[in-house]
């Protein structure tokens, strides 16, 4: 982009092409103007008129007023705007009287006034001087003479200011602006006058011939610079001799009047060029002055010299990229002057000539007739003809997506350009890598039948308190957006408590009359002096949680309660729920033994305060092996159930323990479920810690050495080029090669004249991999940058943006992590990536030395010429066709998020498509494949707004139907693949709950909401990756399908009898070891090596369902995946045997319906509200165990026809995960007319009323004070929501109406 010093110019030329002919003013029209009732817009206009107080401080004058040079007394005592309007109106009318007295209108109406004489006459009249001499010469004949020649016929001194010779006229320049009371040039918003409010700011020399001009110039040569308009000068050719001295207020340095006039003319020229139209005639095409004496063009040290240099370009029609206001303020002119005097270069296309202005013949400028303009053809003039629309400045940095042209530079050239332009070191801001939310994991410790020795439980890692790990934990904590973390954790635990049931009765452990003690209640909250969760509990806004009868608070920092040391015996009563949000670090710090003692003491206090059958909850900062040993030694008999709740808010080992069913004869014990929970906890801790290692600490300047950071280049007035490799273009190419392309931002900010262009992006370990693959650095197409003229806000160097990435990005990141890990296998030589996508993201995931062939139906957005063709290739084509595979070679293949779309495009089902694809990959040489497939590995359950599963059409509908793809059930899909490749190992991969994939989110600067983690895991279980390895023999599993709690046999071929077995479930090793020394935390397991068959035999009785991944590790070698097997839970079938209609009971005695469902599933009655299943009032409906059977007990209510009840499975993670059986039989019940019935509100927040025979009967929302006859308030509420009453109604016909 072109610039003259600091003035940025658009590479487009635009001027008007038609000049307006000067029309002298007729006498009658002059009188009309002067007699106007409002002279605003006729003789003057107020530039800063304030309509509120009707004030103004700057007046712009029009002819003939603009010839007036006010008397010094007028200047010294300025009028306010009201007085000005009265003054000028009165004087104009008086002037009319003088004119008409001398020249009666009827005889002189059509005569033309000489504008020079008229202006001088009006000016002297306003100054109370004699105007007789001017009145004698007021008229002239425009067809015979010019305003100047009509005057030079009378060559003498007309007045002291108006001197006439035979070929010239000298007169002072009238004030083009009048300043009034309140004028303050130091105020930025004051309109600029350019010094033209000062009387005699310049002297004007009109001339009638060129010899006269020469004579005048000779006389003025020794004085100040003389300016001249060459194009259509007003009233005739003239020279302008600016007043000597300087004008204050426009710059920190002194500015001469000549320079200021030159600046005004250039600003006018640039504005007129921007607004020019071929259909509009203007006074002159070239608005700029031209210095004609006493001017040195050899340097550019002064404002006058620089403005003149710019003016020579303005003639051609150049336009400023910044709009010039119609009424420039002092601030606008100061800014323009500052930019013009800033660092930069002059234009050198058009040289200065004293008496001539050069113009480009191809420009739209049409020169006037005369000697003052000459054509000139500059070399390499980069402008073209065209208009430019000023685009409003942007309110933020602009995102730039790179596009490449067919050109490269060497890596060394790119590095050199980067070093010359890089901003380094940078001070970056981090933003927040966690925007909010919580990821909650829940483990049923007591529900696991297999004991596990406490002494063998995994312990807190030895390096947990190492300085580096503590620093990274603190960094992660500070990278979470501000929120009440305690409230978020509390809500996660109470959401679980709302679903907690007695395993024997299936009833909620918290009944409707429970009391609650909150231990560790603190007043240190942003908007409350008590724990924030208590407001939600009191209001009943936690679905399924009854409102406590009372809540009592204890702790160190309590306000609404009692101060108490809860590690000691306490003098209190007992409560149905004791919630201990106590920090052992408060007393113990990082002293682990002391923290263990404090935790055990606090647990004892909580249990002592809990009513029989109640619930105790304890927060434990460090769940160490020593702590668990003490728990089971001291308190194993104190409760019926034990759950571990882990709300991940920050990266700590803190957990909540939930002891249910307080008693004295319990039998709690350490189980394999506890070991799995701890393994998962510490694995997630380690994963987050690894992710944070990529993030620099606060306060560390970014010098380019950290994995995650910002790379930036700054260029001043860059001239990007798509034709040559210059510094700006090279620097841009270098930057783009270093950063994530989708993260690149672009800013343009004025910087004391030059425009500072900053281009920056996010540097990550992934972008480093792509850069390492480049052989040369590709050059970018810069048309979008060259087009940018708007300014932006300054750059913001922030590592994490403000919005969390969507769930789909989390899944993609998890798969990126997996593919990256898999392709590090040194045995891979040539990868084929199907459905790559134009952006070629695979290049950032795989080792830079791995040969890769990418393919997609769309053209490649990368410049493939910048890569070594022996290592990197891109094939554009449809891989679903046979023709695509001609000449394709590989030894491995990936297809991520492409097969479903390809199958849909081909119009075939997924299994058939895979059966067609896999042989083609194998024929191309592929022995390993990673195929992402649409198949529900676990429950066939939709994810609202993400994936809707259409069971009839066998398709997934993504994002509300935005994309529709076929899916296949995993068993027939796997069988079809095994039939094609019977000797291949098959392994499924989904996102692990241990979050080992988080480095590919946090580590690359992507923020996330922790609540999305569990959703992303569920999404991946619907769209898993299948790893097919034809070099590895498959697992042989018997039986298939493999049911839960039944022994199965898994045979694993191996030539190494000393290989170590590892079986993983959800990212955690659950079986590991060697024959005779195998440890299992997922059920009984035995391992032996059968030498004759060269195989391992794993006999396994699984206690948990899901997918298990098998690995064998030979000494000194990496683990080898050997396949995966699936343990299936029992069928989710539910059968409900309702009583016959004639035997239904409509009283509070209720009814029972026999439930047939596998006892593996614990059931509860719920409604679906606000996107989730919510447990109903157990008095309304509940599941009752009558061993060995289970019954649905329910009380009928008129609301039942309007609220659908569900039988839902209950798991530690929630309700309805696998079973949500609609109880339509109750929903469709016809209520009798001859029997009393019951009526309640439908659900929390719902309203209803009753009518009878079409007439209003009773409101249930706002019941009347006096109930209708026969209606009674029931002693027992059997409403869906426990807080609402139930009414008994006499026999009758009722209509239940939802409000």
Swiss-Prot record:
Keyword Nuclease among record annotations: no
Catalytic reaction annotation: a 5'-end diphospho-ribonucleoside in mRNA + GTP + H(+) = a 5'-end (5'-triphosphoguanosine)-ribonucleoside in mRNA + diphosphate; a 5'-end (5'-triphosphoguanosine)-ribonucleoside in mRNA + S-adenosyl-L-methionine = a 5'-end (N(7)-methyl 5'-triphosphoguanosine)-ribonucleoside in mRNA + S-adenosyl-L-homocysteine
Entry annotated with the keyword ATP-binding: yes
EC number(s) per entry: 2.7.7.50, 2.1.1.56
InterPro entries: Ig-like_fold, Reovirus_L2, Reovirus_L2_4th, Reovirus_L2_6th, Reovirus_L2_7th, Reovirus_L2_8th, Reovirus_L2_GTase, Reovirus_L2_MT1
Subcellular location: Virion
Any one Gene Ontology molecular-function term assigned to this protein's record: mRNA 5'-cap (guanine-N7-)-methyltransferase activity
Key words of the record: ATP-binding, Capsid protein, GTP-binding, Methyltransferase, mRNA capping, mRNA processing, Multifunctional enzyme, Nucleotide-binding, Outer capsid protein, S-adenosyl-L-methionine, Transferase, Virion
Domain of life according to the entry: Viruses
Enzyme class, first EC level, given as a word: transferase
Family: Belongs to the aquareoviridae outer capsid VP1 protein family.
The protein's name: Outer capsid protein VP1
